[in-house]
From Swiss-Prot:
Pfam families: MutS_II. This is NAI2-like protein. Contains a N-terminal NAI2 domain (192-490). Residues 184-199 have a biased composition (Low complexity). Residues 43-83, 155-206 are annotated as: Disordered. It comes from Arabidopsis thaliana. Residues 1-24 form the signal peptide. The lineage of its organism: Eukaryota, Viridiplantae, Streptophyta, Embryophyta, Tracheophyta. Residues 171-183 have a biased composition (Basic and acidic residues).
Amino acid sequence: MGRKYVVLGLAVCLFLSSFNEVSCQAEGGIESSNSEFQGSFLEEGEVEVTKIESESQSSSSEQNTKLSMSEENQEDSFDVDKFIESEAVSSREELGQSSSMDEVNRDLEAILDSLNKRDGSDDISKVGESMDAAGIADERRQRLEDIERKLKAAAATNIVVEDGTSKRKSKVEETQEVVKFESESSSASSESRRQSSSSYNSFNKGTGGSEMLGSLGISQSGSWRCYNQDKNGVSEEEDTSIVIPKYDIDSIIKEESTSQGSSSKTSSLIASLTKIVEKHRKEKWSSGVSVSVTKGASSTQTSETVEKLKVTLKKYRGLSARELVARSDFEEILATAARYEELSSASVSHISRLSMYRSVIKEGIKASQRVQLAYARTRLLKEMAVEKQKNVDAELALVKALAERGDMLYVKIFAIKKLISKLEAEKYEVDMTFEKTVANLSRVIEEASQAYEEYHVVVRKWKEEQASEEFSREAIERVEMVWVEFLSTL
């Protein structure tokens, strides 16, 4: 019985050892097949990746519409990258991957790192540019508001200046009409004044020739007015001015024609005109005597005043007309110059012409200020447009970068999908092979168990034969010993 147990234990050990060897051989075959398959698959994957990259480069214009897909699959791409890296590491550790696959993995890692860095730098630069652009836009908005306020103020002042210029123009036109009317009236009455012209010209040389148009004038009512000068030389209208009523020559002729005959018409007309002229001469020279006496007393003071005004006006020689009009004391300067021309008996009144052009010069100054403001506004708007164009260029560059990254992710996703489909097909084949191998293993185990049973039967027979052989050997030895003992007795 003990021998049977020993033999049975040995048989069990042999069976287990054989089963272990069979399982190790099966695992080795599976691993070798897996390594061969993975190596071939990785090589095919590299070829396919290169083909896909070339196809994606040729069709990059058609894949710009897939940016939304890249945003949704961005997070999954990082997991897939990690999965690819882990699979690559495990395949290198287990299978000893080739150098070409290492280079491909390094290129993929470098591309991913550059894309991540580019995204970070683009985000940071975009945030910084947005902050700078916001600050610059606020400053420019404030400057534009200031310019608009200045333009509104300039427009208001322009309206006021236009009103002033229109009023001044109307005044100048009125004065020109008055001067024209006076010149016409003076030319019409030159015959009546011819007799007193020589004495009046001598008086006018003493009093100043600038009052020639204003000292004697005929208004629309027909009244003649004589002007005197005060101590300062400024002409003022006297309260007791001599007013001579206008005589109608036609009425006089009509009266003479009705009262007298046609033969005495000419003589009566001459007598009437002579009376009018004599009366006017007496009244005029009676008032002019007081004026000449007053002017003779103040002639020395007038010359001193002229010299003082000349010295004062010489200070403004270095100024241009634009600068002169822009001064705050322009009205005082203008009054001083007008007074100088009046006292110095200037033949041409330049100051009146300057006063006429004053509004034009001021309007030119305002226009230049408006031009400067408009130029500043144009420059600001140009800077804003340039900044907006820079933002457009930055956004376009970001769109291009995202499009390129989307193309690369699409290529990776496509390659991974093909890889997964091939792995699934390979897994199916491995499962089918595994099932077949398991069935074969069960059959082989049955055959091995039968062989071990036959072996155990043969061993048992061998042991029995060996036991019988030993028994026969012992019996032979005993017989030999008995035979020897028998022979020793002889």
